[in-house]
Amino acid sequence: MKTKLNELLEFPTPFTYKVMGQALPELVDQVVEVVQRHAPGDYTPTVKPSSKGNYHSVSITINATHIEQVETLYEELGKIDIVRMVL
């Protein structure tokens, strides 16, 4: 049984993205830049390195106002060259 995300969420709502990418200094800036375009705000993402240090996990929470915003951000964050996965 498939459940649509928009049926589970009531907007506006806090929504956290977890972005995994290469451990490069520009990763956080690129993630925040994309988020700012679709959900302007003051963000302080949490960054955690992988066990071997090759990747970083960037967690960032937005105040989502509609499902299209959530879906667009998944798509746009995934287009960043150094990003490997968006959860």
UniProtKB/Swiss-Prot annotation:
Name the Pfam families for this protein.
DUF493
Q: Name one GO biological process term.
A: cellular response to heat
Q: Which InterPro entries match?
A: UPF0250_YbeD-like (IPR007454), YbeD-like_sf (IPR027471)
In the UniProt record, which is one GO cellular component term? Answer: cytosol
Please name the PANTHER family in this protein's record: UPF0250 PROTEIN YBED
Which NCBIfam families does the record associate with it? PRK04998.1 (NF003447)
- Family recorded in the similarity comment: Belongs to the UPF0250 family.
Write the protein's name: UPF0250 protein YbeD
Q: What is the name of the gene encoding this protein?
A: ybeD
